[in-house]
Regions:
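Structural motif
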Residues: 72-80, 121-127
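A short beta-strand motif characteristic of beta-propeller blades
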Residues: 37-41, 90-93
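Beta-propeller fold detector
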Residues: 91-98, 144-146
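Bacterial N-terminal signal peptides
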Residues: 6-16
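Acidic/hydrophobic-patterned starts of short beta strands in beta-sheet-rich repeat architectures
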Residues: 57-68, 109-116
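Hydrophobic/aromatic beta-strand elements that line small-molecule binding cavities or substrate pockets
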Residues: 49-51, 79-82, 101-103, 132-135
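Beta-propeller blade termini
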Residues: 44-55, 99-112
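Acidic, small-residue rich beta-repeat scaffolds with periodic aromatic anchors
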Residues: 4-5, 18-40, 102-146
Length: 146
């Protein structure tokens, strides 16, 4: 009986930490469903990179998505944040991304984006300068850290 009682708190702790979990596949589906729901425009949208992590320190994951806006002769990227406020993950905010995004990660609540930027002699097609941008999710906004 003692062994059973000792295991119960650990089991309950494991269950409580799983209640807020979202898998990578679920996050990618949420991102894909979101871009599919956007109204038709002169651009098309594509969720190109998706990461999951706690951005605000509340112990619950947020979903961060690199969304590509693809126009007829141009493209740009933005950072979309999805938050679960008890009714499933919903789009909560966006910020602009710079350059040709290579990777996105979350490190201690900060979104770290590695991009290629054009150097002084680079043709428009082929940026060569490595640049790292950092963003914080604060007050419902994506804020670029300087």
């Amino acid at each position: 009986m003692r062994i059973t009682l000792a295991v119960i708190p650990v089991f309950m702790l494991l269950l409580s930490s799983q209640t807020h979990a979202v898998t990578q596949a679920q996050a990618e589906k949420i991102a894909s469903d979101y871009v599919s729901s956007l109204p038709p425009a002169d651009v098309s949208y594509e969720a190109t990179k998706t990461v999951v992590g706690d951005l605000d320190g509340d112990g619950k994951p947020e979903i961060v998505v690199q969304t590509a806006l693809l126009g007829p002769t141009y493209w740009s990227y933005r950072l979309d944040v999805f938050v679960d406020r008890g009714k499933g993950f919903m789009h909560a905010g966006s910020g602009d991304l710079w350059g040709e995004v290579q990777s996105i990660a979350i490190d201690k609540g900060i979104v770290v984006v590695k991009s290629k930027m054009p150097g002084p002699n680079d043709p428009r097609c082929c940026p060569t300068l490595d640049k790292t941008y950092r963003y914080r999710w604060q007050g419902g906004k994506v804020i670029e850290l300087k």
